[in-house]
């Protein structure tokens, strides 16, 4: 099995190294095509107004000055064009990609692009807690990653479907199994703008998230990782809402 690995945190990210090790536990034919720099939050964007710069890092490792979607296209359509990958793995992201995160995530977009190109694709992310970005339990994704991927592949991924996997913020032995769950939704009142002033008196802004208690919905990715379970969520490329389609057809047709 030929595996193409990408991410959105960049070619030097620790999570990419973790995913390479996971991939090599599944196959000895692993190729890495990842962004030259951190592309977190770029979602499914493409570089349409700038050229893609390709740098060979090692025999089967490449860096692209572009987005995760650019990287997957470069891998499938150029680097591996003679024989394409059988599987695209995107991650392991530093931080969870659950609920509405999936609409912003470059990690999920890497798997989405693989799916568009007809390749089975899985996005993987490692949640972290109060300790912050400097205290990510990569060992949890490392320990459970290969087995989780194998089980997903054995179950089968249908065309047009990608799989989003989130590992909880706990030690590997504390994981309470796999939960196949729906995409959740947070309280968007927690999203805010943090206004600050620079040394010259000019205002600047950061996106911020307020600290507040929030009860995640039952059967969601948010609830699963809160309960120390590995959240596995199948996502569709087709964003059509069928009930509304039917209702609008009756109301507007």
Curated annotation (Swiss-Prot):
It is found in: Cytoplasm. A divalent metal cation binds at residues 8-9, 40, 93. GO terms for molecular function: 3'-nucleotidase activity; 5'-nucleotidase activity; exopolyphosphatase activity; metal ion binding; nucleotide binding. The keyword Hydrolase applies. One of its GO terms (cellular component) is cytoplasm. Keywords: Cytoplasm, Hydrolase, Metal-binding, Nucleotide-binding. Its cofactor is a divalent metal cation. Binds 1 divalent metal cation per subunit. It catalyses: a ribonucleoside 5'-phosphate + H2O = a ribonucleoside + phosphate. Gene3D superfamilies: Survival protein SurE-like phosphatase/nucleotidase (3.40.1210.10). Pfam families: SurE. PANTHER family: 5'-NUCLEOTIDASE SURE, 5'_3'-NUCLEOTIDASE SURE. This is 5'-nucleotidase SurE. It comes from Methylobacterium sp. (strain 4-46). The gene is surE.
């Amino acid at each position: 099995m030929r595996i193409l690995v990408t991410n959105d945190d960049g070619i030097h990210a620790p999570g990419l190294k973790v995913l390479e090790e996971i991939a090599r536990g599944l196959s000895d034919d692993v190729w890495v095509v990842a962004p030259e720099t951190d592309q977190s939050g770029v979602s499914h964007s493409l570089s349409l107004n700038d050229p893609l710069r390709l740098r060979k890092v090692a025999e089967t490792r490449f860096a692209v000055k572009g987005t995760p979607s650019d990287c997957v296209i470069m891998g499938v359509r150029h680097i591996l064009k003679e024989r394409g990958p059988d599987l695209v793995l995107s991650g392991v992201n530093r931080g969870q990609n659950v609920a509405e995160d999936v609409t912003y995530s470059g990690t999920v977009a890497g798997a989405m692009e693989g799916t568009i190109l007809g390749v089975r694709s899985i996005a993987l992310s490692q949640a972290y807690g109060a300790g912050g970005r400097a205290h990510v339990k990569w060992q949890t994704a490392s320990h459970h990653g290969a087995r989780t991927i194998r089980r997903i592949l054995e179950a089968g991924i249908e065309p047009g479907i990608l799989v989003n996997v989130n590992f909880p913020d706990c030690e590997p032995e504390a994981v309470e199994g796999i939960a196949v769950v729906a995409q959740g939704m947070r309280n968007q009142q927690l999203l805010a703008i943090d206004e600050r002033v620079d040394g010259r008196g000019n205002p600047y802004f950061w996106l911020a998230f307020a600290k507040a208690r929030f009860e995640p919905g039952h059967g969601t990715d948010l609830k699963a990782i809160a309960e120390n379970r590995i959240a596995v969520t199948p996502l569709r490329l087709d964003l059509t809402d069928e009930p509304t389609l039917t209702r609008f057809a009756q109301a507007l047709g």
